[in-house]
């Protein structure tokens, strides 16, 4: 029972560290996301990167233009079948327990192939977290690069075993090839899923509803139905369960046996596995719903002057929200008992690359934490309610923005558009660091802008010049004078309504796009 024993050992060995520091050595008083679960959730979330869907639609239009809408050409039919059989896949590249790459499949390349192109020999001794078990074509290359460990989500693999196309036996043959590569390679190919710590789901639900983005909506639109958040969360749960779970338990067992996890098909291992997967999907859906596509809210400039300059142009709202959810996930690794903050830095190259993220590439990320290597009792943890200023935390905690800059894996290039996504407004100490690093855009909430608190102030953000600031707010352009319930989409800085027919199928597109 190798795989089952493997999961048990990992769960017991790491359960105590699931509330650990940057170094995994400290235990806190609030539930925290383990690094393994964080990397797993980010891989699932990267599978949903919006740019991939746009590429798929563009490719479909191009193919229809070449072959006609019926696709009666035999070669066209074969290619279409192959693409339906290959599932979109997200990937997180980790080195020394630090994230050095966030990737997803593109129209032409699998996630593992993209990682090899982007990182090359630097993949040596890295850990890779896939949202699906990689195919043999990817596995042989990344194993050859000398990776340390490959973890994957134990559901339908990259070469789908669920689609009708798999009846050709190609998917089963690929699964056998993957198992042979696994058994004869130095890299450890495994499933790393840990049970969430006690009260983690409840904690995420409470903090997601109370986060700056949801609270800004309720304050700006006091007449809005307060159930909108919970309705969107339920929609996301259904959508993600369709994507990341195999609804039929017997079919799930069949897939597990085919991909070499037959020992997980027996209870209690199978029931525990599915429960852990459901809990993580619930957590992901909850966090994703905290930055909702709601009416005319999004990340906008308060004063849209010089909007035509490239560094002042906003990202499409779908991508901005996606990146902010990445930061929200990172915030659940916080060591601050009061306020969890996450930050992620991306940059946009001059031309579209092979990655499913298009021209955008990952630079760095972080969350607020105490210095690396610290133990729980090394530093004070009290906030400004403590009268004795000597035992307050603010002199010792390192903010998320600073950790993102410190542990970045790419240099920030002055000629490129770089952007940081922060779950809360940057404080007066972080603002000059962001500007000094050469970051061109800041995406954040504005609930604390202009406030001065006991130990920290947020006065500089509003006065900051030379960096474009996109804050979560109701669209200031006045375009929301349309029907209040009419959906919207912001593409390339232009706000336009979504046709009713498109709106009705918006949630289904991600599910349909993976087959």
From Swiss-Prot:
Enzyme class: hydrolase
Compositionally skewed regions (Basic and acidic residues) per UniProt: 60-83
Catalytic-site annotation from UniProt: 401 (proton donor)
Region (Disordered): 1-27, 56-83, 494-515
Subcellular location: Cytoplasm; Nucleus
Enzyme Commission number(s) from the entry: 3.5.4.5
Domain CMP/dCMP-type deaminase: start-end pairs: 71-169, 318-483
UniProt motif Bipartite nuclear localization signal: location: 489-511
Database matches in InterPro entries: APOBEC/CMP_deaminase_Zn-bd, CMP_dCMP_dom, Cytidine_deaminase-like, dCMP_deaminase-rel, Deoxycytidylate_deaminase_dom
Statement: the UniProt record of this protein carries the keyword Nucleus: yes
Molecular functions per Gene Ontology: cytidine deaminase activity; dCMP deaminase activity; zinc ion binding
Stored CDD domains: deoxycytidylate_deaminase
Binding sites annotated in the UniProt record for Zn(2+) 1: 110, 135, 138
Signal peptide: none
Keywords: Cytoplasm, Hydrolase, Metal-binding, Nucleus, Repeat, Zinc
Binding residues for Zn(2+) 2: 399, 427, 430
GO biological process, one term: cytidine deamination
Short motif (Nuclear export signal): ranges: 272-284
Cofactor(s) listed in the protein's UniProt record: Zn(2+)
Xref: Pfam families: dCMP_cyt_deam_1
Function per UniProt: Catalyzes the deamination of cytidine and deoxycytidine into uridine and deoxyuridine, respectively. May play an important role in testicular development and spermatogenesis.
Family: Belongs to the cytidine and deoxycytidylate deaminase family.
UniProt cross-references to PANTHER family, sorted A to Z: CYTIDINE AND DCMP DEAMINASE DOMAIN-CONTAINING PROTEIN 1, DEOXYCYTIDYLATE DEAMINASE-RELATED
Protein name: Cytidine and dCMP deaminase domain-containing protein 1
């Amino acid at each position: 029972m190798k795989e089952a024993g493997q999961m048990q050992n990992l769960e017991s060995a790491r359960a105590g560290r699931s509330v650990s520091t940057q170094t995994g050595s400290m235990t806190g008083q609030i539930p925290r996301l383990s690094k393994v679960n964080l990397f797993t959730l980010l891989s699932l979330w990267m599978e949903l990167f919006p740019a991939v869907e746009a590429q798929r639609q563009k490719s479909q239009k191009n193919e229809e233009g070449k072959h006609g809408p019926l696709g009666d050409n035999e070669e066209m039919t074969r290619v279409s079948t192959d693409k339906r059989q290959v599932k979109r896949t997200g990937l997180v590249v980790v080195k020394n327990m630090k994230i050095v790459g966030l990737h997803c499949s593109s129209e032409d390349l699998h996630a593992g192939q993209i990682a090899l192109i982007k990182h090359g020999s630097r993949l040596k001794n890295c850990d890779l977290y896939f949202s699906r078990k990689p195919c043999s074509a990817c596995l042989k290359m990344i194993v050859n690069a000398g990776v340390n460990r490959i973890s994957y989500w134990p559901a339908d693999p990259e070469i789908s075993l669920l689609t009708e196309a798999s009846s050709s036996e190609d998917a089963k043959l690929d699964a056998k090839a993957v198992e042979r590569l696994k058994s004869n390679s130095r890299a450890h190919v495994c499933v790393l899923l840990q049970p969430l710590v006690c009260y983690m789901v409840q904690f995420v639900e409470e903090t997601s509803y109370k986060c700056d983005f949801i609270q800004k909506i309720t304050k700006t639109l006091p007449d809005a139905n307060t159930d909108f958040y919970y309705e969107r969360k339920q929609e996301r749960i259904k959508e993600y369960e369709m994507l990341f779970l195999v609804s039929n338990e017997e079919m799930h067992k069949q897939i597990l046996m085919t991909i070499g996890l037959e020992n997980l098909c027996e209870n209690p291992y199978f029931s525990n596995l599915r429960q852990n997967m459901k809990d993580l999907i619930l957590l992901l859906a909850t966090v994703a719903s905290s930055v909702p596509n709601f009416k005319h809210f999004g990340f906008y400039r308060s004063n849209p002057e010089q909007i035509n300059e490239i560094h002042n142009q906003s990202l499409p709202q779908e991508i901005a929200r996606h990146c902010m959810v990445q930061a929200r996930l990172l915030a659940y690794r916080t060591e601050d008992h009061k306020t969890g903050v996450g930050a992620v830095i991306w940059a946009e190259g001059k031309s579209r690359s092979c990655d499913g993220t298009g021209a955008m590439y990952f630079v760095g990320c972080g969350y607020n934490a105490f210095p690396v290597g610290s133990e729980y009792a090394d530093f004070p943890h009290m906030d400004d309610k403590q009268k004795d200023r000597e035992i307050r935390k603010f002199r010792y905690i390192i903010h998320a923005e600073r950790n993102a800059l410190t542990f970045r894996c790419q240099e920030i290039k002055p000629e490129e558009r770089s952007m940081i996504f922060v779950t809360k407004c940057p404080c007066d100490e972080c603002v000059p660091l962001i500007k000094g690093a050469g970051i061109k855009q800041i995406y954040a909430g504005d609930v604390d802008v202009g406030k001065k608190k006991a130990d920290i102030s947020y006065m500089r953000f509003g006065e900051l010049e030379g960096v474009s600031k996109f804050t979560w707010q109701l669209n200031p352009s006045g375009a929301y004078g349309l029907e209040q319930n009419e959906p919207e989409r912001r593409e390339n800085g232009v706000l336009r309504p979504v046709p009713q027919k498109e709106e009705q199928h918006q949630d289904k597109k991600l599910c349909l796009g993976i087959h």
